[in-house]
Structures are given as C-alpha cells and as structure tokens.
Amino acid sequence: MDKLTDLNYTLNVITLLNSTLHTILEDPGMAYFPYIASVLTVLFTLHKASIPTMKIALRTSKCSYKVIKYCIVTIFNTLLKLAGYKEQITTKDEIEKQMDRVVKEMRRHLEMIDKLTTREIEQVELLKRIYDKLMIRATDEIDMTKEINQKNVKTLEEWENGKNPYESKEVTAAM
C-alpha cells in the first residue's frame, strides 16, 4: 500500500510539474524554459532517488556518516557533470586509495628495475669471463694434435703385440 501511495504521490508531482511548465510555456517571454525544465527534472529525480536510498543505507549501514558523505559527494559530482565540468569532488578515502595504488605501482617498478640491473650486472660479469677465456696467450710451440684429432692415435710400434686392431679377423660361431 505504501508503494501505491508513493506512486500516486509521484504521479501527482509530475502532473503538477507538467501543468506548471505548460503555464510557463504559454508566456511568450520565457526564453529559458529548457534550462528550467532540465533543472526541475534533475531536482525531482534526485529527490525521489536519494531519499529512499538514504533511508535504506542508514538502516543497513554501521557508519551513517560515511554513507551520508558518499551520497552528498555523488550528488555534487552528478550536478557538476550536468553543468559540464570535468572535475569531480573526491573524498579523503578515495585520495588515500589512489595514493596507495600509486605507491604500489612505484614499488613494482622499483623491483623490476632492481631485477633488470641485477641481470645486467650478471651479463657483464659473464661477458668479462668469456673475454678473459678468449684472450690470446703467447706460446712458443702450438700443439696441433688437438686440432687434427690425433692425440690418441697409436703408431704401428705402439700397438699391442704388433697387431693391427683394425684388420678383420676370422670368427667361428657354433650352430
């Protein structure tokens, strides 16, 4: 029944607004009609939307001050947007949240920079070791046996019993 009464009240207010606006329209000197109509519509919408919302929020919320502050900031931001401003009103909580987000992002960037510098230092050390190993050393005699893979090659005199291990042998197998 309460909702029906509220609906009737809303319809009566809309009818009153329409009749008022029609009487204003008949006056030919009224040049600001669209602006007045927009302001009245916004005020009526805010009135109808904010009062039930505030009642519910105050009943369910533990901290009514924060709810009221949030609702007022939202209403002012809406009015600023309707007026064409791009700036918004922010509360201290929102500013602290943004500052925390910025600080967290800066910490993440610092950690990334630290990791990158550590990797670069390791790469420089690795390049130094590679350079040290590649340095040309002066020697009197160059051992070419490593280059032609003859370090483990035996001559005929070094073979066991003087036999060539690569010659084929006769193998007998039992059937």
UniProtKB/Swiss-Prot annotation:
Its main location: host cell. Glycans are attached at N8, N18. Disulfide bonds: none annotated. One of its GO terms (biological process) is viral process. InterPro entries: Rotavirus_NSP4 (IPR002107). The keyword Hydrolase does not apply. One of its GO terms (cellular component) is host cell rough endoplasmic reticulum membrane. It is a single-pass type III membrane protein. Belongs to the rotavirus NSP4 family. Plays an essential role in the virus replication cycle by acting as a viroporin. Creates a pore in the host endoplasmic reticulum and as a consequence releases Ca(2+) in the cytoplasm of infected cell. In turn, high levels of cytoplasmic calcium trigger membrane trafficking and transport of viral ER-associated proteins to viroplasms, sites of viral genome replication and immature particle assembly. This is Non-structural glycoprotein 4. It comes from Rotavirus A (isolate RVA/Equine/United Kingdom/H2/1976/G3P4[12]) (RV-A).
